[in-house]
UniProtKB/Swiss-Prot annotation:
Family, per entry: Belongs to the bacterial ribosomal protein bL9 family.
Protein name per the record: Large ribosomal subunit protein bL9
InterPro entries: Ribosomal_bL9 (IPR000244), Ribosomal_bL9/RNase_H1_N (IPR009027), Ribosomal_bL9_bac/chp (IPR020594), Ribosomal_bL9_C (IPR020069), Ribosomal_bL9_C_sf (IPR036791), Ribosomal_bL9_N (IPR020070), Ribosomal_bL9_N_sf (IPR036935)
Any one GO CC term of the record: ribonucleoprotein complex
Natural source organism: Rickettsia massiliae (strain Mtu5)
Length: 171
């Protein structure tokens, strides 16, 4: 299937790119999400005319996202959970819970689909989580999962100590 991107798509292309993609990918993801349109002759002509509008709109969105990104960057989210004796959680910390807490902290609604977890968070510790608000912008947030508030503070102190040791070694 040949498509024209109307929004930037990570690892695929930018606005106005004409690409060949698998039929299922185009039909089930790109078209319903309004990330692309079919590459017919009338659409190709339309995109040539409207490419500047799409790029201006994307630039405006990107500027808003950069402001939000500045708020999100370096956030530390603490989750206090019950665990077994060996530190395993009863359940897990989900991307929805991370999105809700982050939205609460920055006073901006962040969707759970923007939270990228490498693996499920099922034990206590410190995790780095990627927040993808735009195809070209990512932020990293620190998630701390602990049994109590004092344990979370211990994790933070431990993290600061490791960071200062790393800086001393590199100097």
């Amino acid at each position: 299937m040949e498509i024209i991107l109307i929004k930037p798509v990570r690892k695929l292309g930018k606005i106005g790119d004409i690409l060949k993609v698998a039929d299922g990918f185009g039909r089930n993801y790109l078209l319903p999400q309004k990330l692309a349109i079919r590459a017919t002759e009338p659409n190709k002509e339309l995109i040539v005319k409207q490419k500047h509008e799409f790029e201006a709109k994307d630039k405006q969105i990107r500027e808003e996202v950069e402001k939000i990104n500045a708020l999100i960057k370096d956030q530390k989210l603490v989750f206090i959970r019950q665990t077994s004796d060996d530190g395993k959680l009863f359940g897990s910390v989900t991307n929805k819970e991370i999105a809700d807490k982050l939205s609460e902290n920055v006073s901006y609604n962040i969707s759970h689909s923007n939270i990228i977890l490498d693996k499920q968070i099922k034990s206590t510790g410190i995790y780095t989580v990627e927040i993808r608000l735009h195809a070209e912008l990512n932020a990293i947030v620190m998630v701390i999962v602990a049994r109590s508030e004092s344990e979370a503070q211990d994790y933070l102190r431990e993290q600061k100590t490791e960071t200062s040791e790393d800086l001393a070694e590199s100097a």
